[in-house]
Structures are given as structure tokens and as C-alpha cells.
Amino acid sequence: MGQEVSVAVFSREDRQRYRQKVRTCLDVFARMLRESRFDSDRRSFGLEIELNLTDEAGDPAMANARALEAIADADFQTEIGQFNIEINVPPRLLDGDVFTELEDAVRSSLNRADERAQRVGAHMMIIGILPTVGERHLTADAFSAGHRYSHLNEQIFAARGEDLEISIAGVERLATFADTIAPEAACTSVQLHLQVDPEGFANHWNAAQAIAAAQVAVGANSPFFFGRELWRETRIALFEQATDTRPEELKTQGVRPRVWFGERWITSVDRKSVV
């Protein structure tokens, strides 16, 4: 997960092997569930924070390679755009003063990283969508170095077969097309990863879905994109559309997108258990 991809071209045989590998992994996962082989005694969580890099004027700074070299901390990694980086906070056990300790550790890491990034002309900014990002910042040239993101771009467009349509109607309306998935780079977030036991997975999943609206109401911070005022939380629509492999015909047929909120409750960790 997250490793660089060395292969430049994927054959039909590669796709078949990949599908078989996924099925094998699902079979192993199902067996582990049946045999209760998951650790339920050590409850832990992790945190991932995606950030934007800006220059002195507040515009996107295509400088994550230089910034990461200056930061020199393995917890900080690239994200899809050259003006993005992320910090992967090591997992912690849920006990004692863990949240206070987490806050202190994250603040210290971010402050130190920002100080070092500024040495190469980059400032770290935590915001859902950087208001200054424009179409010129979201092209194929904006991808981070390496093959990982360009391969993702190629595979999404191979499945889709046409440009991405970005259509968001809010206070103002945005209607445009993109020939890469670079608009995804505009969306940054904080992601909490909670380890739960299989028996409690459904309750945690359903609870997360139930409070999603309240979380958005409290934490929405991406009203602007491409100079237009759209949704209070534009990331929802933008991320869904920027990763959509469906052409218009499949949308009309009711095929689900790659990214969405879901539509019903679940009763267990089994992917077939929905109500």
C-alpha cells in the first residue's frame, strides 16, 4: 500500500492476476472472520492529515519534493499533487491521555515541518480546498513525481473513455471538463482510522454514516473552487466527480460511482450484509 509502481504498462494478463489476487485476499479475510483471528483486545487508532503547500502569495506551491527533503521525516509523504503532502501519524492505543498526547505530538510535528518547509519557499496550510487553486494548477504537470499517480490517472480514463465532467451548482455554478484526475488534488482532508473488532464493525460504520451530516455542518471548510462559491463542503461533489470512472451511459443505468456515501445500513463486516 502506497509503494511506488515500477511497471509502465498493464497487460490483460495483469488485470486477470490482479482480480484473482483480490478474490484470494477476500477469501482469506472471510476465513479470518470465521476463525476469529482478529485482535479484539488492543483498540487503537491512527490519523492521516493532508495539507496544501503555498507560496508567499498564498498560491499553490508545486514544491512537495523540495519540502519533503527539507522536512526529512518519514511520517510525511507525497500526495497526488505537487502542492500536497500528508502526515501519517503512527497508530496509538486508546487509553490514558492518548488524545492529549496525540494533539501535542501532531502540533509539534506540524510546526517543525512547516518551519523546515519554509526554508524552500513553501508554507503548509490545512484547509479543505485551497481557495487560490485554479485550472492552471490542476493539469498533468501537477502530479507528484513517480509513476503511482500517473498510472491511477491512466486507469481511470481507460475505464471512463472520455474527459471528466465537473458540474457543481451552489451559490454559483461551475461547469467544466478535465482531461486528468488532477482536480482530485484540490481535496484535502483529515482521516481518522479506528480499529474495531469485527462484531462491532457494523455499529461503528452505521454510527459514522449517521453523524456524517453533523460533522459536515461543523467542519465544512471548502466553499470555493476555481474562483466560484459553490457548496459549503465542495469536496463532496468534487472528489466524487474527479474519481468517477463512469461515462454518462453508465450513470444513466444506475451504476454506482467509485466514491459515495452509501445508501443503507449494514449488519456485519460482510460486504453482503446490508439492510
Specify the residue positions occupied by each region the protein language model found.
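Phosphate/nucleotide-binding catalytic core
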Residues: 1-275
